[in-house]
């Protein structure tokens, strides 16, 4: 059955349709197609991460949004040759927005194992992963007292071998769980929170109408 449409109804439908298109465009524009950021060395262990007397280790990250998954590429330089690491996305950073240690930091929260890394003989490495990252990466455990989804918008990597950080004061009898054997060394480098939203750099579309800020998926 067809219904007659008056000129007024046609005008209303046109306005609603135009608004829907505009709203949709704004949502798409709010989500960046890619983002880039640098990781910051853990000051306690930077001398074991790089070559003594050499330039400061660096790590740059680029994430490109995809239709079904995102592509993250990490490139590092000035690393001590042949060192191995384990990369994770985590809920919290140990740093403040200015890159200094956060005195209120207690733990990294939820962590997702993403990739192994290893420097070559020149102290460089590059690795690429494809997974859900920008604005949506999360995990949850319904058995926990807080079963809600938890985002992991920070990125960091840990020394794979605790002995590689022993000369800088790491207690090798107390390894961290950040490798496949759960016998890793300390944090080597990690991302910083945004100074305004306090969210990690994998959130490109923050919602500042909430307190604390959240991320629009």
Q: What are these model-predicted stretches?
A:
Residues 2-15:
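Bacterial N-terminal signal peptides that target proteins for export
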Residues 12-24:
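Bacterial N-terminal signal peptides
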Residues 24-30:
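Sec/Tat signal peptide C-region and signal peptidase I cleavage site
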Residues 31-217:
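N-terminal leader/targeting pre-sequences
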């Amino acid at each position: 059955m067809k219904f007659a449409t008056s000129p007024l109804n046609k005008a209303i439908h046109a306005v609603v349709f135009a608004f829907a298109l505009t709203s949709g465009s704004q949502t798409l524009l709010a989500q960046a197609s890619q983002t880039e950021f640098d990781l910051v060395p853990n000051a306690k262990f930077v001398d074991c991460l790089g070559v003594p007397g050499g330039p400061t280790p660096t790590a740059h990250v680029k994430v490109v949004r995809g239709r079904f998954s995102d592509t993250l590429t990490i490139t590092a330089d000035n690393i001590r040759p042949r060192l191995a690491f384990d990369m994770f996305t985590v809920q919290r950073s140990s740093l403040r927005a200015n890159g200094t240690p956060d005195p209120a930091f207690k733990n990294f929260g939820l962590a997702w194992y993403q990739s192994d890394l290893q420097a070559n003989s020149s102290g460089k490495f590059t690795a690429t992963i494809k997974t859900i990252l920008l604005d949506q990466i999360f995990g949850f455990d319904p058995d926990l007292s807080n079963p809600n989804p938890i985002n992991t918008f920070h990125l960091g990597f840990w020394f794979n071998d605790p002995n590689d950080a022993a000369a800088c004061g790491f207690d090798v009898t107390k390894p961290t769980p950040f490798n496949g054997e759960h016998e890793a060394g300390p944090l080597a480098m990690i991302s910083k929170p945004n100074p305004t939203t306090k969210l990690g750099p994998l959130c490109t579309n923050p919602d500042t109408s909430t307190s604390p800020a959240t991320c629009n998926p």
